[in-house]
Amino acid sequence: MSDLVLGLDIGIGSVGVGILNKVTGEIIHKNSRIFPAAQAENNLVRRTNRQGRRLARRKKHRRVRLNRLFEESGLITDFTKISINLNPYQLRVKGLTDELSNEELFIALKNMVKHRGISYLDDASDDGNSSVGDYAQIVKENSKQLETKTPGQIQLERYQTYGQLRGDFTVEKDGKKHRLINVFPTSAYRSEALRILQTQQEFNPQITDEFINRYLEILTGKRKYYHGPGNEKSRTDYGRYRTSGETLDNIFGILIGKCTFYPDEFRAAKASYTAQEFNLLNDLNNLTVPTETKKLSKEQKNQIINYVKNEKAMGPAKLFKYIAKLLSCDVADIKGYRIDKSGKAEIHTFEAYRKMKTLETLDIEQMDRETLDKLAYVLTLNTEREGIQEALEHEFADGSFSQKQVDELVQFRKANSSIFGKGWHNFSVKLMMELIPELYETSEEQMTILTRLGKQKTTSSSNKTKYIDEKLLTEEIYNPVVAKSVRQAIKIVNAAIKEYGDFDNIVIEMARETNEDDEKKAIQKIQKANKDEKDAAMLKAANQYNGKAELPHSVFHGHKQLATKIRLWHQQGERCLYTGKTISIHDLINNSNQFEVDHILPLSITFDDSLANKVLVYATANQEKGQRTPYQALDSMDDAWSFRELKAFVRESKTLSNKKKEYLLTEEDISKFDVRKKFIERNLVDTRYASRVVLNALQEHFRAHKIDTKVSVVRGQFTSQLRRHWGIEKTRDTYHHHAVDALIIAASSQLNLWKKQKNTLVSYSEDQLLDIETGELISDDEYKESVFKAPYQHFVDTLKSKEFEDSILFSYQVDSKFNRKISDATIYATRQAKVGKDKADETYVLGKIKDIYTQDGYDAFMKIYKKDKSKFLMYRHDPQTFEKVIEPILENYPNKQINEKGKEVPCNPFLKYKEEHGYIRKYSKKGNGPEIKSLKYYDSKLGNHIDITPKDSNNKVVLQSVSPWRADVYFNKTTGKYEILGLKYADLQFEKGTGTYKISQEKYNDIKKKEGVDSDSEFKFTLYKNDLLLVKDTETKEQQLFRFLSRTMPKQKHYVELKPYDKQKFEGGEALIKVLGNVANSGQCKKGLGKSNISIYKVRTDVLGNQHIIKNEGDKPKLDF
C-alpha cells in the first residue's frame, strides 16, 4: 500500500479533498471541488411546465375532435353571421330549456370541453374525510349547490353577481368575506351536457344518440393514470406498452424496488401484515429490559404482539406501559427504542392492520397472511377507485371481493392515505418470512441474524475494473441532492486512485442537511438558539448578581470558563446536578474554585466534548464522582442526592437537552466494550442511511478487488471538535475551507484515539486513566490532550499558513449542456412609443398592474404615476377616462386611514371607490362603460428577446430573460485583439429533415457579424459557464485566473462577466490585475476583453483541480449536437 490517506468532505454543493502521508504527515494534495447542488425545486418547475403543456395539448385535441364530430354529423356552422361576443355560460343555461342554433350549441359544448372539471372529485365527494380544510369545505359547498343547479347556472350567476367566475377569489356577501372556487366534478359537467343535448335533440334531428355518446366520450374520456402514454401500436417505455413488447398492468409496479438480499423478489408493502410483524419484532428485540437476560422472551413477544393487534388505539406510551406491567417494572427501565427527530419514542404498532379491522364489510381477522399481504400491495400501489378495482380483480381472480367490499376499500384507502403512502419495505416477503421465526426465537436484531445466517447483500459491482461505478453506488440513494454529491465524490476517489494508487485509508464526512437553504437555516437556527440561551443566562446572572442587565466586565478577568459555567448554571436551574444543592451566582463568580465543569460521561468513553456532555458541579462532588457515571456514583457518595432524585429533577427540566438528559440518566455499564462501541458509533461514526450506503458500497468494492483500503465515515461534530481544539477558524467567505476540512478528516484517522479505542483504558478501581504507551496514570485533562493532539508536528501550523491557503486548487463543474431552458415562459406584448426623453419611437415591453384594487396594485400605480403618468396606455389612448375618472378618484378618496389600534396606515383610493360604487368604469356619457380592473403601461425598452410574433400581429410578441449558453473566443491577428461571440440556448434548433439539434452555419455567421467578429479572425476556444479563464497582461506580466460566467452587455462588443477563482463572488470594488481595473461596487465583474496587450487562455481542470492550459481548441467551433 501507499501509506496515503484520502479525506473527503462531502457537502451539498462541494467536495473537499485532502491527501496526506500517514507516516510523515506530508500533505500530498488538497483541492475543493465545487458544483451546483441538485435542486428538487427545479424538478418541480419542470414537472409543472410539462403538466401545463400536456393539459394544453389535450385541450386542443378535444377541440379538434369536437370540430370533427360536428362535421361528420352534418351540423354545419357559419360564425360569420353571429356575434363574436356571445357568452358561452349564457348559452349553456339557455340550452337547458330553449333551442340553440348550431353555432350557439358549438360554443356551449366547446366551452365545456375546454373546462370539464376534475375527475377525482367524483370519488372525493363520497369520502367522509375529504371535507378537511378551507379548500375542501368550499368544494363541498359547490357540491351542495349542484343538487339544484348545473355548473353553468352557478358560473353564470357568479359572473352576473360578482363580475368573475373562474379561479379562486374572495367576495363580500352579507357584509362578510366569502371565498369562491370554480371547481366542479367532471360528472356534473357530463350531466349538464346530457341535459343540453337531450333538450336540443327535441329541436334538431341531426343530434342523434350516437352524437350524444360520442360527445360525452370526448368530454369525459381520460387515459387511466396507471397506464401512462402510448398504445399497442405506439409503444413507449414511459407507459404500460413497453418497447420490449411487454404490457404492464400498472406502470407504477416497475418502480417498486427489488429485495436487498433476493434480487428477483419485489419489496413488500410496509402496510403488509408480514412487514408489520417483522418491524415490531425487530423493535422488540432491540429493547433492553430489566430481566435476567435483559431481553424479552419468545412468550413475552407473542403476548405483546397479540395485545397490540387487538387494541383499537395504540402508541409508544401505551405499549411501553403494557410491557412494563408485563415485566413488573417501571416504563423508565425500558431502553433501546428508536427516537424521532423531536426526541420522542418510536415503535411499530401494527397501525395498518388495526385500522383495517375497522372495515365493516370485511373480517380482517379471518383473512390469512397471504391475502392480507396482497391486499396491502394493492392499496399501496393504487390510489384511485379505478386502479384499486382493477387491481383487486386481477390479484383476486376468484372474485373474493364483492362490489360493496370494493367500495369500502376504496374509501378506506382514501381515508388512510398516510398509512399506505409510506411505500415499500427494503425486504421482500420471502426474506421476512425466513427472519420472523428467528426474531421470535432469539433476541437478535435483523442485521445480526442476517450475518449469522450468511445472507449476503446482492451487489451489481463489476470486477472488470478497479474503479468504482458511481451510478451503481448511488442507485440506493433516493435523495437527488445527496446522490449528486456522492457521484462527484466517487469521481474524485477514482481520479485519486488513478493518480496516486490505492489508499491505506479513506475517511469521509457527509453533509448534515440535504438542501443548501435547509443547511443555512439549520445553522442559523442553532446559532440563534445558542445566542438566546447565552443571553438569557447572562441576563439572569446579572439580575441576581447586581440587579442590572449586564455583569461587570471585571468578573470575567482571569476566569475564562465563567461564561460557560453561567450557561450551564442557567441550564441546570441554578443547581449542582451531583449534590442537588443550589448554586449562588455570587459564589459562582466570587469563589470560582468551588465549582468545576465535569464531563457527565468520561471523554475517553464518549469522545463527546460538547456542552451536552458537560455539567457545572461542586469541585468536591466532582472529585468524589471520578470517572463513573451519575448512576454508578451518586448513591455511594457522601455529599450527594440520590440517583432517584436526580432522575426526577432531570425528567421535569425544560432547559436540559434530550442528549444531556440521556447522558445523566444512563444506567449502562461503561466499562463494557459493547457500550463503548455504541458511544463510538454515536459520536464518531456517521450511521445515517446515505452514509451507510456509501460506506458499505466502498467496502464491498475494495473487498471484491482484494484491496486493503480501510473506509470510515465520521460525524461532522467530531471534526468540528478537532477544529476547535486545534484553533483552526472556519470562514465560509471562500471555498478554501472544504479542502482544509478534508485534511482534518484525513488526519483524524491517525489520532491516538483510533489506536486506543479497542483497549481497556479506564482503571475504575482507582478512578484513573492508564496511558497504554507509557504505562503512566494520566488525568482526564491529560487524556483529553492526548486524544485531541494533532497527529503530526507542525500540521496545524501548516493548515493556518497563508502559503498553504494559496496552494489549494479549485475545480468547478462546467455547464456545457445545450438543452436547457431558453427563456422565461412569460409572453410579453410590445408597443412602439416615445417615452420620457426618447427622440424617436422605440419598442417597449408592456407591463401590467393586474389588480388596481389591492394595496400592492395601488402602490405600483402611484410609483409610475408620480414618475411619469404618460407611461400609462390609458393616459395616451383614453385621456377622458384618465382625466375624468381615475384622477378625480385619486383627489377625492383617501390614501391613508386610521386602523383599529388608532394608528395611521396606507389604504387604496380605488378600493374605497369600489366599496361605494362598485368597479371603476371607463368614461361614457351614460356611465356604463367597461369595468376597469387592471392597467397597462410602457415598462422597459425591448432588449434581448425571442420573437414569437404571430403572422397577423401588428406588434411584436416576445419572450424575455433569454439565457446565455456559451462564448466562442476568436483572435484578430490584424488588430491583435480578442473577439468574443456569445451564443444563447435559443440559437439552437432542430434541423428540418435530419432532426439534428444544432446552430446552422448561416445563423452562426449572422451572429458572428452582429457580435463584431471578423470573418478572418482565428477561432481559439469555447467557454462555458464555470470554465476557468487565465488573463495575462503581456506588458506587466501580471495574470489572474477567473471563472467564466457569460457573454454579457450585448450592446457592448466583447464584454464578459467573470467570477473569482476561489470564492462565490467578488467584493464590491475589489482590485483585479491593473489592465482590468476594479470590480464594480455592486460586486459584478463585467469586463471587455477586446483590449490590446492581453493574452487569454482557457484552463481546463480535472476533478482534483489539476490545471491544463488550452491555447487552441481546434480549427472551428462545434455547431452540431
Curated annotation (Swiss-Prot):
Binding site residues for Mg(2+) 2: 9, 513, 738
Use in biotechnology or industry: The simplicity of the Cas9-gRNAs RNA-directed DNA endonuclease activity may be used to target and modify a DNA sequence of interest.
EC number in record: 3.1.-.-
Active-site residues annotated for this sequence: 9, 599
Keyword annotations: Antiviral defense, DNA-binding, Endonuclease, Hydrolase, Magnesium, Manganese, Metal-binding, Nuclease, RNA-binding
Keyword match Transmembrane helix: no
HNH Cas9-type domain mapped to chain residues: 516-684
Ligand binding (Mg(2+) 1): 9, 509, 513
Gene Ontology BP term (one): maintenance of CRISPR repeat elements
Described purpose of this protein according to its UniProt entry: CRISPR (clustered regularly interspaced short palindromic repeat) is an adaptive immune system that provides protection against mobile genetic elements (viruses, transposable elements and conjugative plasmids). CRISPR clusters contain spacers, sequences complementary to antecedent mobile elements, and target invading nucleic acids. CRISPR clusters are transcribed and processed into CRISPR RNA (crRNA). In type II CRISPR systems correct processing of pre-crRNA requires a trans-encoded small RNA (tracrRNA), endogenous ribonuclease 3 (rnc) and this protein.
Similarity-based family: Belongs to the CRISPR-associated protein Cas9 family. Subtype II-A subfamily.
Domain notes: Has 2 endonuclease domains. The discontinuous RuvC-like domain cleaves the target DNA noncomplementary to crRNA while the HNH nuclease domain cleaves the target DNA complementary to crRNA.
Subunit comment: Monomer. Binds crRNA and tracrRNA.
The name this protein goes by in its record: CRISPR-associated endonuclease Cas9 1
The organism's taxonomic lineage, starting at the top: Bacteria, Bacillati, Bacillota, Bacilli, Lactobacillales
Gene: cas9-1
